[in-house]
Amino acid sequence: MDALYEANDAEYALHMLTKTDDRSWYNMIRVGSTISLEAWDNKYKPNQDWNHAWGAAPANIIPRRLMGVEPLTPGFGTARIKPQLASLEWAKATIPTIRGAIRMEVENKADAYILKVTIPANMDAEVYLPLPRGKYTVTNNGAPVKVSRVKGEPFLYAGKIGSGSYTFVVN
């Protein structure tokens, strides 16, 4: 999963997270598991255990990659905010850190991309937004933002922010 996000293939990663066939996290729920299994299904490994850490990948992939929250310095002094929603239209998360919760809501509309983020006290964050096609404008709390394109990636760097609440809009 990490490799898919590193390769900027968030769409396939989203497909892996949300698929419902017998080789999926959804199937683990369907077969009655209350925690992650060792294999996708008993038919692939009849002697599997029903408490296996590898299957818990979505528990760290969703906050770190889909929502894009990762520490850049020890103790989350500086965080990176780099959501990769792919075709997902909306997501909301509260990510606990040692310095307090990062709260995020992302809307991925046809005409605008909206990132609402709250950074706790004693933390700052570098913000990345998806690179849209064609002409675009970026605002933060209604004011224009000068952004730079990230070399070799489909992202814009919107700058470093301190603690507080922000609404970034790309349209």
Question: What residues fall within each predicted segment?
Answer:
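Amphipathic alpha-helical repeat scaffolds
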Residues: 1-2
